[in-house]
Amino acid sequence: MMSEVRVRFAPSPTGSLHIGGARTALFNWLFARHHGGKFILRVDDTDLERSTEESMRGILEGLQWLGIDWDEGPIYQSQRLDEYRKFANKLLEEGKAYYCFCTKEELEEMRKQAEREGRPFMYTGKCRNLTKEQIENYLKEGKKPVIRLKTPREGKTVVHDIIRGDVEFDNSTIDDFIIMKSDGMPTYNFATVVDDYQMGITHIIRAEEHLSNTPKQILIYEALGVPLPQFAHVSMVLAPDRTKLSKRHGATSVQEFRDQGYLPEAIVNYITLLGWAPLDGEEIFDVRKSIREFSLERVSKNPAVYDVQKLTWINGHYIRSYDLDKLTQAIIPFLQKKGLIGENYDYEYIKKIVSVVREREKTLVDIADAMTYYFKEVESYEEKGVQKYFTKEGVVDILKKAAETLKNLEPFNKFTAEEAYRKLVEELGISSSALFHPTRLAISGRTFGPGLFDIMEFLGKEKTVARIERAIKFIEENIKG
């Protein structure tokens, strides 16, 4: 039986939570929840110059919005510097690491020499065997050394990867790399190993780009004499053109998707599909199913291709099936941003409109756009609609009859309005589309949307008639008969 699973997500607060990072967090979280384990949030903030509180806040809010909760943390690396120094000193005392006093100029010369010899640059190990006396003299001179790990010159380091199988690295390609910088800060690889060991991390699930760091990290584990966790490197998320996903491919951060009106459940559903799928192959599923079925063995080795159209299609499904109150609450900030409502609004009225508008829309932004004419006067008419319906012979007379009919209608609701329109079609001897289409364009400015009589009921008699009369005026003034 597996001991308690402990996994972590360790973002650097130097940017936003993007789709790849969100997927890494999600896969760790699903794995922990599937096994009844712990999901730990750690913040890799040792790059003090680039780390910002704003970025950290955005990452935490993004995870919370997606429903990815953590059991421990956030734990900040910048608050653990004494721990890294303690472990580095242990390696120095045991002769597994050493002080290196090489200057920038000396390292540059080594780099040039490697270039001249046509080989990749590797640190030569110049300071590997300094005597105690030499070290003391350098320190007395005020030289600030880095600390390097003594790496084996021969043999191979093998990464046993749950997703990729065994990946071998030749030790001759790994130089004596730095574990502590001259300013006393740990390097990424060293801090990562110390943290993962002290936090009892059992499985490291992360992006494929970290695979090249793994042999160095294994060598640190071995030098410290502590057990290795299991590794699982998840393939990259590529853009549709199969290049690295970047801003030029549109929205890539969780915050951008949130601002564009995607629902958190839809994003979680979609990013779960980036390299994994449920047993039945379904594309729409909730997070409970993902937790039940998730396993690393079924994560694909092949790169996942990001497809915003598929995400939007999935989002449309969630928009249609979402709890109506939750959807209404989610849409309100978008309506406020568009200036359609203020701080005080008629919640029930908005909810009724959302119930009919959502059937055709795919994002909250789409819904807010589609709701515009319920709150504001129609400012323009779709050009294709004008050409198709407002230029037809007799349309002004038809709309005048419609306005007159609706003015005298009591009571006014979608059922009585439809009945009156059906009768008018018969009286005028025209097709229903000759009346319905220009009316829709007149009262909404659009050629499609919810049911025509639903719109009329929401607007009420006065607004409906006024908009038809305004359209008549527009046709008479702008369209030459």
From Swiss-Prot:
Q: Which UniProt keywords apply?
A: Aminoacyl-tRNA synthetase, ATP-binding, Cytoplasm, Ligase, Nucleotide-binding, Protein biosynthesis
EC numbers listed for it are 6.1.1.17
> One GO cellular component from the entry?
cytosol
Annotated catalysed reactions:
tRNA(Glu) + L-glutamate + ATP = L-glutamyl-tRNA(Glu) + AMP + diphosphate
Q: Where in the cell is it found?
A: Cytoplasm
Q: Which residues bind ATP?
A: K247
Which ranges belong to the motif 'KMSKS' region?
244-248
- State one Pfam family annotation: tRNA-synt_1c
- Would you say which domain of life the source belongs to? Bacteria
**CDD domains of this UniProt entry?**
GluRS_core
Q: What class of enzyme is it?
A: ligase
Protein family (similarity comment): Belongs to the class-I aminoacyl-tRNA synthetase family. Glutamate--tRNA ligase type 1 subfamily.
Q: How does it assemble?
A: Monomer.
The record's function comment reads:
Catalyzes the attachment of glutamate to tRNA(Glu) in a two-step reaction: glutamate is first activated by ATP to form Glu-AMP and then transferred to the acceptor end of tRNA(Glu).
Please state what the protein is called.
Answer: Glutamate--tRNA ligase 1
